[in-house]
Amino acid sequence: MTISQNPALDTFEGLFNEAEFVYRHLGSNDAKQADLLSAIGYSDMATFINETVPEPVRLHKELDLPVAMSEHAALAKLRTMADDITVNKSYIGQGYSPVRMPAVIQRNVLENPGWYTAYTPYQAEIAQGRLEALLNFQQVCIDLTGLELAGASLLDEATAAAEAMAMSKRVSKSKSMQFFVDDRVYPQTLDVINTRAKYFGWEVVVGDFELAKSGDYFGALFQYVGVEGDVKDLTDVIAAVKKNKTYVSVVSDIMSLVLLKSPADMGADVALGSTQRFGIPMGFGGPHAAYFAFSDKAKRSAPGRIIGVSKDSQGNTALRMALQTREQHIRREKANSNICTSQVLLANLAGMYAVYHGPGGVKRIATRIHAFATAFADVIKNANDSNLNVLHDQFFDSVVVDCGSEKLASQIFQNADNVGYNLWRLGETKLSVAFSETSDQKDFNVLTQLFVTKAHDLPEDARVSLDSAHLRTDAILSHPVFNSHHTEHEMLRYLKSLEDKDLAMNRSMISLGSCTMKLNATSEMLPITWPEFANVHPFAPRDQVTGYVAMIDSLQEQLKAITGFDDVSMQPNSGASGEYAGLLAIRRYHESLGETDRDVCLIPMSAHGTNPATAMMMGMKVVVVKTDDNGNVDIDDLTAKSEEHSTRLGALMITYPSTHGVFEEGIRKICDLIHKHGGQVYMDGANMNAQVGMMQPADVGADVLHMNLHKTFCIPHGGGGPGMGPIGMKAHLAPFMANHTLSPVHNAQKDCSAVSAAPYGSASILPISWMYIAMMGRDGLLKATELALLNANYVAAELKDHYPVLYTGKNGRVAHECIIDIRPLKEETGISESDIAKRLMDYGFHSPTMSFPVAGTLMIEPTESESKEELDRFISALKSIKAEALKAKAGEDNWTLENNPLVNAPHTAAMVIDGEWTYPYSRETAAFPLPYIRTNKFWPSVARVDDAYGDKNLMCSCPSIENYM
């Protein structure tokens, strides 16, 4: 006798249902999928797929992956790997320190989908919370560096240093091709600088910082505090080098700047560094938000994003991303940087650390760190041991002890490891001990006993040993936001008030084309705060991180199975970084064959702007290839240009499915053509959500591909970062993947330098993708791809009678996204794609991608995670908006093209309850245009933002409180 008429419940296997997560991730079950198929004219999924995905690219075999695991089983398996990680107390330093993230910030920001599932704040009206948090971050950076402006974060300290070098060349009036680097910089920073400089033809000169005075350099970069922990006043050196038209950047420890004289006071043009010490776990290297501060005159040359203060249509203060046309991916062929993302979630965490602790709190923490280091140095000095010598008198947190012999240094180092402490070796005889905000009395006892054989207690008085000339005298963090939220209740409510201003995926679908805003499941997110993954230093001894490396190796094997490639590099910490690493491998490969002149890169005109920007960074000549009327690469033009540049052809950069959202029939032919002429095929993985289980990029001819783990493999977008962009490559390119000075990659050549600061990039978020793949299994991953394709085609079919669908494949099908053309409606009514985007906010939705890859269009990518009900709400909103536009054109009910719900959108609660309603439509039409909105209303916190005003009156620091009243 069975307990159910459902056969699946007649066996224990069915009762356990290991594949249950698959149906939690997918927005529609089998019955709903049947409804979707029926709506577009199909009776089964197989027929639909056969007419959507070209037969020549199809993968007619199962992925070499295990079947799905349950959430519990996947977490248990990951736990076994985490248990194989030893978390010693880290006193390594070298740019990474243990921290204490305030619990109120961890729970209410890092672990809150209202913060981590949002997209980059291009739609400012529904992103005021994140924008305010980022403005706080910028204010922290401005205050501590003393410079006039700061960006909203870069990827990490080392890449920020490389960006400073590129910016120096843009801004400097020097004709020199040499860039000076202080020999006191961290090795990983120099590694990334060398990588970036090579293909621009810049010579990196490394030496004692005083030597910068005598050379002719377009830029100079100094470290403050140095790799040995020493603090040097750079004022005289900076003044001297600036006389030679040298642009000066200073890499600064953010926590040290709480006490030390600011870079601006010493004359720096740029200050940069990591904000990891402001409450962000080390995470085996990342993710962390780098800061980048600069002078006002350099604002149009600075990399990355800048948050600025503007006004909305009602005259109220509103925030936005400022000067967007200077972003590198928009500048395309004119760029010398491809930066198009940042670390928003991490920047918000760091900014909130300053908000919660306030000026007094951060000064107490910084002073405690320094006092620990001073007390430790005093113990060593007072021991009167001739073998031990403290190298520097002026330091912030790191004390370097010369042990006099390699034997003694090795003995102390090993003894420290034996009792659970990691120190750092500098050469044969020197040990560095870097104190942090987690240092305590027990640590002090242990560390002193390691060096002088007797445990010492902390002295009663906390001594500051820095000379007064090194200390700052100006006030920091004086804005009210840093002085108002120091109790947990106040902080909790402040965070909630910001969260409520933002529309994230915990509210509704975000259908941004080419962005893949899919479910970020809670079970995928849980492991990132496990101490084993969060609290490990990237340069910890390898025998302590066996489980971490095992997890990363396992993820690499998963990605190899999915893509068909022979090897994977996990170092790139963004999609753009992955592009860079991919082209870098291609250039190095050609050089290994003696073909140094293969410097032409073919790029379809529809490509994302990072593609030509990346090619320019690699010293390549960009040749644009036409696309045909169906959105495909023009094969005739590609053939002609391949033949024209045959002897110099280095690479083709291509996105598949195309940026136009179509599976190109001729992708194999395209790859064969490039190979025939000696080039390599770089595939952009932005649209990989249409590939997984359906095809393999290596199989169709790609040589290298970057994978956006923050798109296809479920790392959340974080409101604009973090991301990960690992690259898969064929065997002939594998030796040329990025390496690392301090942690070499086993199969990369020694002379291949790094593309990011840490060996594995943003390692602590890799468990998210590992969990996703493990829980979906080979069959679930294919189901996800099928449903992503089905959802996009359902949306296209439902909207095609209202908005033209711009591109389709041979059988009238799109891939995983579709482009609807707004230009005919705009020509007829004057209503633009921007008006539609703003009006969608009133309907509770974030706009699809605007005007990319075609101006005057919207690109929609619903992903597999959205239900039919949510798709139908979105479709009904777009249909209703079309009807509103036509009503305005017809002049019904006194609506006009100049005064209607679209051009006045979005409507805030303040507008709707205003006693004087002057619009020709009702308040209900403004705020509740469809019935579903009544039960789930999202109110934009500001009306339409004035972009022109914001750029003309640029203000990128926190406004006074009166501006909000």
UniProtKB/Swiss-Prot annotation:
This is Glycine dehydrogenase (decarboxylating). GO terms for cellular component: cytosol; glycine cleavage complex. PANTHER family: GLYCINE DEHYDROGENASE (DECARBOXYLATING), GLYCINE DEHYDROGENASE, DECARBOXYLATING. Pfam families: Aminotran_5, GcvP2_C, GDC-P. The keyword ATP-binding does not apply. The glycine cleavage system is composed of four proteins: P, T, L and H. It catalyses: N(6)-[(R)-lipoyl]-L-lysyl-[glycine-cleavage complex H protein] + glycine + H(+) = N(6)-[(R)-S(8)-aminomethyldihydrolipoyl]-L-lysyl-[glycine-cleavage complex H protein] + CO2. GO terms for molecular function: glycine binding; glycine dehydrogenase (decarboxylating) activity; pyridoxal phosphate binding. GO terms for biological process: glycine decarboxylation via glycine cleavage system. It is an enzyme of class 1 (oxidoreductase). The gene is gcvP. The keyword Oxidoreductase applies. Its EC number is 1.4.4.2.
